[in-house]
């Protein structure tokens, strides 16, 4: 088994799982969900399970599978975690989406110890109306390694533009059309 893990580039005895990544997520990323509440939510492993935070908000497990987990960590805030297998290790991709007034996301990629490797915050498309305020909501599709950004103008729920990127352990590049 050790040889198989080593051949796959996974350090022996240190296999990173979605649950272990969520359990070790620093408070800076998980706030306002403290470690005790996070443990209660994750121990259930049942999507929809909700716990009350120390500030009276709710922490809810939205989804969980072998490569990703999604948590609602407050009203209008979603953390979408994905594991990115890399040559020598597995990285953690964390999409934080705030829904106020429109969904707006940012992507941060960390090593297994939650040390920041790089960030990605796309700029509004050139097709955006001049002077408008644009919000980009990200969705990652692991099967195709595609990061989709849906752009909306402030005050308008309709998608104004859609951009697709390929997400790799080294960075993000625009997908070919």
Model feature map: region roles:
Residues 80-85, 137-139:
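Beta-propeller blade termini
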Residues 117-177:
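Short aromatic loop motif centered on NTY/YTY
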Residues 4-83:
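Terminal domain-start segments
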Residues 66-68, 89-93, 144-148:
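Short, hydrophobic/aromatic-rich segments at coil-to-beta transitions
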Residues 87-122:
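Mid-length scaffold segments of soluble, non-membrane domains
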Residues 71, 97-102, 154-156:
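Short consensus segments that form the blades of beta-propeller domains
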């Amino acid at each position: 088994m050790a040889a198989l893990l080593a051949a796959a580039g996974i350090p022996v005895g240190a296999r990173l799982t979605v649950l272990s990544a969520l359990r070790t997520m620093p408070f800076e990323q998980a706030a306002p969900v403290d470690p005790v509440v996070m443990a209660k939510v994750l121990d259930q492993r049942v999507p929809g399970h909700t716990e009350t935070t120390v500030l009276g908000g709710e922490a809810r497990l939205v989804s969980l599978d072998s490569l990703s987990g999604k948590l609602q960590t407050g009203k209008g805030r979603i953390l979408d975690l994905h594991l990115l297998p890399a040559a020598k290790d597995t990285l953690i991709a964390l999409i934080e989406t705030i829904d106020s007034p429109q969904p707006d996301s940012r992507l941060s990629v960390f090593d297994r110890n939650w040390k920041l490797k790089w960030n990605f915050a796309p700029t509004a498309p050139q097709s955006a109306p001049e002077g408008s305020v644009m919000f980009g909501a990200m969705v990652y599709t692991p099967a195709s390694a595609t990061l989709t950004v849906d752009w909306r103008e402030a005050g308008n729920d309709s998608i104004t533009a859609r951009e697709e990127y390929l997400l790799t352990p080294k960075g993000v590049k625009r997908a070919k059309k």
